Regions:
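Catalytic cores of TIM-barrel enzymes
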Residues: 1-344
Length: 344
């Protein structure tokens, strides 16, 4: 192993910008679909040399349209896809007609579903004194479009805002129970996702975000904080116009600050003393298309931009590393993330 995993205390110092000798690593071994199939034991052997500074545990979420366990009601909505899904993900929504909204709310999954934390509890023996992060995908925006469909959601912002607010409160109640479960098990943070941006800006106007999402975010973050935990948010795309709102809501760590979408120098200089960054190394171009030297230089560039002695920087991959990525580039990334030090 290149170095020992960082302690829980060191990670907390980095998140809270109170110093720390090393930059914590998380999601640096974010393997996309097909990567392990391609490289197999070679990738496993390589990855074993690089520590996970964060222990992450994922509860069993409700299924989309089909239950994720033996309880047929443990899913967000029912659709008969027994013959396969033959259309885009944006059309696999659970709530097609708002006339069914009351029924949908009555049939909401139970956050206290028996067994949904069994795997989390069993995995705790592997935490080894590290920072413990409770995880699930999809918070508000992502859950809204999964329930309504992306096109419907864009219309709902203007025609059905009242219903979205009711749905948001219902989701908030659900998430609070999940947060409670993680808190009872001694977790240090909550990681979740809302891809709020596309390549050139947010998926909704800042005004829509302020009216609909900001109150939900504030209450969610406040609740997590009340349990003594941090909030980590994964949000792809260009979130520049929403940064002030995310900071106002109290988000502690933002991932990935997507390369090509956000101006890293501006983000680091403007917001680096207000929020911490889990910067994600570019998986769209640098890792799959660059040379080993390109990968190393990119990591040097990122650290030199974001590093501060007081902390506030964590490092990983921007998203799932895909199988078109050369193994030598993955090795170079892991080496530099673990060994490179700020030099300016």
């Amino acid at each position: 192993m290149v170095r020992e995993p960082l302690s829980r205390e060191e990670v907390i110092k980095a998140i809270e910008r109170k110093g720390g000798k090393n930059i914590p690593l998380f999601l640096h071994k974010f393997w996309g679909a097909g990567l392990m199939d391609k490289y197999g034991s070679k990738l496993e052997a390589l990855a074993s040399n690089y520590p996970d500074d964060i222990f992450d545990a994922w509860y069993l979420e409700p299924g989309f349209h089909i239950s994720s366990n033996n309880n047929p009601s443990y899913r967000w909505g029912y659709k008969d896809y027994s013959h396969g899904i033959k259309h885009s993900i944006g059309e696999t929504y659970e709530l097609l007609d708002w006339d069914e909204f009351d029924w949908f709310l009555e049939d909401f999954p139970n956050p206290n579903e028996p067994g949904n934390f069994d795997a989390v509890e069993k995995s705790l023996k592997h935490a080894d004194g590290r920072y413990k992060l409770g995880c699930w995908w999809r918070l508000f925006h992502e859950r809204f479009w999964a329930i309504r469909g992306m096109e419907n959601l864009m219309i709902d912002y203007y025609e059905n805002m009242d219903k979205l607010k009711v749905l948001g409160e219902k989701l908030l109640d659900f998430y609070k129970v999940i947060v409670d479960r993680y808190a009872q098990l001694g977790f240090d943070g909550i990681f979740t996702s809302d891809d709020l941006g596309h390549q050139t800006g947010p998926m909704m106007s800042p005004a829509i975000f302020k009216e609909l999402y900001l109150p939900l975010y504030k209450e969610f973050v406040s609740y997590v904080h009340s349990k003594g935990m941090h909030v980590w948010l994964h949000s792809c795309g260009d979130n520049t116009k929403l940064m002030d709102y995310l900071i106002e809501a109290g988000v502690d760590v933002l991932h990935p600050i997507q390369k090509g979408c956000m101006d890293e120098v501006y983000i680091a200089s403007t917001y680096g003393d207000k929020i911490s960054f889990l910067y994600g190394i570019d998986v769209q171009h640098v890792l799959p298309e660059g040379s080993v030297e390109d990968v190393r230089n990119e990591i040097h560039r990122v650290i030199d931009i974001f590093y501060k002695p007081e902390g506030g920087l964590l490092l990983g991959a921007g998203n799932g590393i895909m199988p078109d990525t050369p193994l030598e580039n993955i090795k170079a990334m892991l080496e530099e993330l673990s060994l490179y030090k700020y030099t300016k």
